Design a protein with these regions (language model features):
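Well-ordered beta-strand positions enriched in small/hydrophobic/aromatic, beta-favoring residues
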Residues: 1, 34-36, 54, 94, ...
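A short, sequence-level motif marking secondary-structure junctions
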Residues: 20-25, 50-53, 69-73, 125-128, ...
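N-terminal mature ectodomain segment of secretory-pathway/periplasmic proteins
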Residues: 1-61
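Gly/Pro-enriched, hydrophobic low-complexity segments
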Residues: 105-192
């Protein structure tokens, strides 16, 4: 997957980031190998989740990312669409939490709670059966990710545009440029040198 993100930094300024993401599927989300290379205007580094650990790579040197950066990266993994699509493999529980009309759209609410206690609410359109948004909480902050521009990529329906808010303030906007499934990914991308 290759795309662009607009991120709001600690100072409230928006930064444009190009990213490239590689994934090797595991038996569950916790066992997957995921690497995201991020290129900011002034720096380029990678965040990697492999062997149930998160670490960074900068100029081929391994580093421990800040706690907030690691948590944000892990939230993209564990509070994403895959949490619902792969709930059985993850050992998660599903609860149908109701049905409601919000701003003219009829939604089913599905709560997914994984083995680690992470809870994500999915808002599924009763008309299209697509996930239109998700909610989760982390450290007292309410996050909401909205999904837009669903299109097919190799027979898989993918939201090409997402917006993440924290306590109703936009902190991230992502636009996928290209996505490819089924390609061989070199395992060396996920080596941490230990």
């Amino acid at each position: 997957e290759h795309g662009k993100m607009s991120l709001v930094n600690d100072k409230g300024q928006t930064e444009q980031v190009s990213y490239q993401k590689w994934t090797i599927r595991g038996d569950s989300l916790a066992k997957e190998k995921i690497r995201v290379d991020e290129e900011y205007p002034s720096i380029r580094y990678a965040l990697v989740r492999a062997d149930e650990k998160t670490y960074g790579v900068y100029n081929q040197a391994v580093f421990s990312p800040r706690d907030d950066a690691a948590k944000e990266f892990e939230n993209r993994i564990f509070h994403g669409l895959e949490a619902l699509l792969r709930y059985k493999e993850n050992g998660s529980t599903l609860d149908l939490a109701g049905h409601e009309k919000i701003m003219g759209v009829d939604y089913y609410f599905i709560d997914v709670t994984d083995k680690s206690g992470r809870k994500t609410r999915f808002y599924v359109s009763s008309k299209t059966y697509r996930v239109m948004m998700i909610d989760y909480q982390e450290d007292g902050v309410k996050y909401r990710r909205k999904f837009y521009d669903y299109n097919y990529a190799q027979g898989t329906l993918v939201p090409y545009h997402t917006i993440l808010t924290a306590n109703d303030k936009q902190i991230e906007e992502t636009r996928i440029m290209t996505v490819t499934f089924g390609q061989k990914v070199d395992d060396e991308l996920f080596k941490n040198g230990s």
